[in-house]
Swiss-Prot record:
Family per similarity comment: Belongs to the complex I subunit 4L family.
Membrane protein topology class: Multi-pass membrane protein
Domain of life: Eukaryota
UniProt protein name: NADH-ubiquinone oxidoreductase chain 4L
Organism from which the protein derives: Talaromyces marneffei
Length: 89
């Protein structure tokens, strides 16, 4: 349980510190999502519940789709702008 909280905090820290790089922001979001999935998985093992394990598989599937859509949007953004860094004004 402490490991998943630690991973979630690393994801938040990575998201906050890397506000100009979209790829690192996407990786940080994935780390946070996988930390939550790991916490759900640990809880389902502790309570001997198969529903939590099924839910974890569902979350991992959605995370894969989210990554594919995010990278597709990133490629379109790169083609439009020529750079993937975010400009704050």
């Amino acid at each position: 349980m402490n490991f998943s909280i630690f991973l979630f905090l690393i994801g938040i820290l990575g998201f906050v510190l890397n506000r100009k790089n979209i790829i690192l922001m996407l990786i940080s979001i994935e780390i946070m999502l996988l930390a939550i999935t790991f916490l759900i998985l640990i809880s389902s093992f502790n309570f001997d519940d198969i529903l939590g394990q099924t839910f974890a598989i569902y979350i991992i599937t959605i995370a894969g789709a989210e990554s594919a859509i995010g990278l597709g949007i990133l490629v379109a953004y790169y083609r439009l702008r020529g750079s993937i860094s975010i400009q704050y004004k």
